[in-house]
Amino acid sequence: MTEALVVDDSHFMRTVISDILEDGGVDVVGTAENGARALDAVTDVQPDVITMDVEMPEMDGIEATAEIMREQPTPILMVSALTTEDADATLEAMEKGAIDTFAKPGGTISTELSGHSEELVAAVERVASADPTAGHDVEMEPASPPDATTSEYADNPTLLIGASTGGPNVVESILASLPAEADFRVLIVQHMPDQFTSRFADRLDAASQYDITEAEDGSRIGGGEGLVARGDYHMRVSGYSNGRLRVRLDQSERLHSVRPAIDVTFKSAAERVTDPLVSVVLTGMGSDGADGVRAVKDAGGATLAQNEATSAVFGIPERAIETGCVDDVLPVDQLTEAIADSIRRTT
């Protein structure tokens, strides 16, 4: 049975979360009202997973996450309100080592959480299975610039990135090291709640030489630009011409129980994009992305996957690899170089 530590400054929320987890078959072995108490509790009860509030007195969730990852790495699920402030703080906590996030419906003191019991239990179990040390503090190998006499980048390439649990840091690392001269159009699908994807796009934009924004219905991008799929919306490539692509957003049925789905974006890109196409699937649980990788491969695109050793959860890459359509499986620090290599051409 999975053993959990529940950390929240609200006694009400500690009780609600604990009851939901216990009813769902998770053993709550301890609770704490702030980050400082959480540090002691982690040592005492050694849980499999921690649910961590963001805003708490004495020591908040960001500080606590950083300390826990330094002293006793443990999978952490950030449980935060759907606010801009909490979204920023949660993404910072994930940068410090938290694995994933669960959005409290209705605010910091959520009376609606019991209506999302199954989702919370599933998130806790998913995070408990993650390797909290995989892929952190990675120094990306920068892509080598093309040799002016022997090679150059192909024209109008498109890069597709799909990720779930443990993905935000990896996506940011790839974007931060992606060479501007490659001039990719970038489409990113990260399983993440609405309200969070806008802030995630802002972080990627700040870290990258590419102009990254959250997708809107009808968004168009060209070289050097990228879109993050909006939370709770599928992102489909609806048109492609002269190196510019257009996307449409919709709230059609969830695929693999998620929206946005990696497969929706990858398959639509494979159908529409007529110039070089590269896909990479990263850490996460489930099979989303496998069909999309197959579609990209069938369309003549390059396909890459993150390896098990650097994946917090290896489900998504593993399912894609099992299709037989993945060209290369690499540690996270080698992915940017491989992405760039896939569009080099000899002159």
Swiss-Prot record:
Q: Which cysteines are joined by disulfide bonds?
A: none
Q: Which domain of life is it from?
A: Archaea
Keywords assigned by UniProt? Chemotaxis, Cytoplasm, Hydrolase, Phosphoprotein
Region feature (Disordered): 132-154
Q: Which Pfam families does the record cross-reference, listed alphabetically?
A: CheB_methylest, Response_reg
Q: What subcellular locations does the record give?
A: Cytoplasm
GO MF annotation, one: phosphorelay response regulator activity
**Record note on modification:** Phosphorylated by CheA. Phosphorylation of the N-terminal regulatory domain activates the methylesterase activity.
In this UniProt entry, the residues modified to 4-aspartylphosphate are D53
CheB-type methylesterase domain mapped to chain residues? 152-346
Q: Where is the Response regulatory domain?
A: 3-119
Using the UniProt record, give the first listed, main subcellular location.
Answer: cytoplasm
Which GO BP terms, alphabetically?
chemotaxis
- Which reaction(s) are listed as its catalytic activity? [protein]-L-glutamate 5-O-methyl ester + H2O = L-glutamyl-[protein] + methanol + H(+); L-glutaminyl-[protein] + H2O = L-glutamyl-[protein] + NH4(+)
Catalytic residues in the record: S164, H191, D288
Signal sequence coordinates: none
EC numbers: 3.1.1.61, 3.5.1.44
- Stored SUPFAM superfamilies: CheY-like (SSF52172), Methylesterase CheB, C-terminal domain (SSF52738)
CC annotations in GO: cytoplasm
How is loss of this gene reflected in the phenotype of the organism? Deletion leads to the loss of both chemotactic and phototactic responses. Mutants show increased methylation of the Htr transducer proteins.
Which NCBIfam families does the protein's record reference? PRK00742.1
What is the recorded function of this protein according to its Swiss-Prot or TrEMBL entry?
Answer: Involved in the modulation of the chemotaxis system; catalyzes the demethylation of specific methylglutamate residues introduced into the Htr transducer proteins (methyl-accepting chemotaxis proteins) by CheR. Also required for Htr deamidations, at least at a specific glutamine-glutamate pair in HTR-II and a specific aspartate-glutamine pair in Htr4.
Note what the entry says on domains. Answer: Contains a C-terminal catalytic domain, and an N-terminal region which modulates catalytic activity.
Q: Which family does it belong to?
A: Belongs to the CheB family.
Q: What name has this protein been given in UniProt?
A: Protein-glutamate methylesterase/protein-glutamine glutaminase
Q: Which organism is it from?
A: Halobacterium salinarum (strain ATCC 29341 / DSM 671 / R1)
